[in-house]
Amino acid sequence: CLEVWGDWACFSRPELKVERVSYDVITPSAARAIFEAILFKRYAMRWQVTKIEVLNPIKWTTIRRNEVGALAGKSSIFIEDKRQQKNSLLLQGVRYRIHAKLVFIPVKDRPKEAFIKHQPSDDENPMKYYQMFERRASQGQCFTQPYLGCREFAANWKYIDNTEQLAPPLAEDRDLGIMLYDMDFEGNVQKPNAM
């Protein structure tokens, strides 16, 4: 379990193409990405988010951001010619408690490309990866900086031990509408399907 927070967050709604508008709360895929930033072993394990608790009231703010109005391609982009100011509707002062379980992939079920650089031992078990995560999360270690929707909005985090007394989540019930759960990269890595 992790408690994550930050000054700003933007979990962009895909149906709004031009201006960035955030979902009301963190998406499950963004929550999974925070766990993966701390520990990611592509062929050995994956994270499955089981519960997201909202700890701070949902507050909105708008800002204008400079963005590049062109797709990166083979030719270089002169940023000064392609710069655009766009409005963003963001979340302010967010705090979440995210619960996830580690799904271990047994050695026999891993694809052949998993063994190109590293030959795992046959006695690998999920506890090895759970302890790696626990150690890394409690010491503030990560492979990449976790973020809250957009890389500009860095996430602070704290590992929550099972013995800690937890503050109750926000006592509010609200319809969040349709929300992207995650992307399925199993079938096609180039064009994943929405889940």
Feature map (PLM): residue ranges:
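Intrinsically disordered, low-complexity acidic/polar segments
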Residues: 11, 61, 105-109
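Residue-level signal for well-ordered alpha-helical segments
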Residues: 8-12, 29, 75-79
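A residue-identity detector for tryptophan
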Residues: 5-8, 47, 60, 157
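Beta-strand elements of well-folded, non-transmembrane domains
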Residues: 4-8, 56, 98-106
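N-terminal, Lys/Arg- and Ser/Thr-rich interaction peptides
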Residues: 1-18
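Glycine/small-residue-rich interface belts in oligomeric ring/scaffold proteins
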Residues: 16, 21-66
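Internal, well-folded beta-alpha domain core
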Residues: 67-69, 73-195
